[in-house]
């Protein structure tokens, strides 16, 4: 088997799934299927759960005729869980699973914050609350900041070592093994060792097990943390183009190419970029 001309590492929320509706546009699925059918390897590198990715991305691709040998893998919960489209078996790293008190705290807090968010109970390793789709972003953002403050207070009261952005609150041993990570539509409690770089390494291992690896990659994301995918691949000596679909626009000064889709953001930009990769 010859090495494919390029591979894809895709964040899901934003580049693939709409942050507003949490659904995937049909044309994007069609183009992704075409790329997979032509042997392009694809890794979905996301904070989403395997349940979400299997239902919203993999199942619709299967309905469209996903080939049995398609090289499609999902690394979820920022590297803590993963699944391959071929067998559907979900794997999890127990060392990246948050303590039960994190889930218990979310269930307690949601009683006061259910007007703006809900608990994502599909997560296997992380503990997550997500914005309700019927709540305006500015309302969710305000409530999220209040929630995050209460969450931090609860986790530190439970004597967990935790980090929120640049603030560190060590445990009795001086460690901060856990992280609160707010995003546009969610707040995650996760292992500090997790992240998009770990997801990229897991994705490479999954691809290496089913065929040759390309030496050129397109990574697509909507947050600054998604650049870690490109950093990881560039560090291997591969040719990388990172596509930033966020409203903020791309970073400058990276050692690899960074681009955007003029006039488009989120899933519209992701769909347009994937369409442009199709052979003419």
Regions found by a protein language model. Give the residues of each.
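Short, hydrophobic/glycine-enriched beta-strand segments
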Residues: 6-12, 44
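Conserved acidic, metal-coordinating active-site core of Asp-based
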Residues: 118-218, 231
């Amino acid at each position: 088997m010859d090495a494919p001309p390029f591979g894809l590492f895709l964040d899901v929320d934003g580049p693939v799934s709409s942050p507003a509706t949490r659904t995937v546009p049909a044309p994007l699925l069609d183009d992704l299927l075409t790329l997979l059918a032509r042997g392009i390897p694809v890794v979905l590198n996301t904070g989403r759960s395997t349940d979400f990715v299997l239902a919203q991305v993999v199942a619709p691709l299967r309905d469209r005729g996903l080939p049995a040998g398609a090289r499609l893998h999902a690394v979820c919960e920022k590297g803590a869980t993963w699944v391959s489209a071929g067998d559907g078996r979900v794997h999890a790293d127990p060392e990246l699973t948050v303590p039960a008190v994190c889930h218990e705290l979310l269930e307690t807090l949601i009683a006061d914050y259910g007007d703006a968010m809900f608990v994502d109970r599909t997560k296997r390793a992380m503990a997550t609350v997500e914005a309700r789709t019927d709540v305006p972003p500015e309302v969710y953002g305000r409530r999220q900041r209040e929630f995050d403050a209460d969450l931090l207070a609860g986790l530190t009261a439970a004597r967990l070592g935790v980090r929120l952005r640049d603030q560190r609150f060590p445990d009795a041993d001086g460690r901060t093994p856990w992280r609160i990570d707010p995003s546009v539509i969610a707040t995650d409690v996760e292992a500090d060792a997790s992240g998009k770089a770990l997801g990229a390494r897991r994705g490479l291992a999954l691809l290496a097990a089913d065929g040759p690896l390309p030496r050129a990659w397109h990574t697509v994301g909507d947050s600054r943390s998604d650049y870690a995918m490109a950093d990881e691949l560039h560090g291997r000596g591969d040719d990388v183009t990172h596509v930033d679909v966020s409203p903020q626009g791309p970073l400058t000064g990276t050692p690899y190419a960074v681009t955007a889709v003029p006039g488009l953001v989120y899933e519209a930009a992701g769909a347009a970029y994937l369409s442009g990769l199709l052979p003419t």
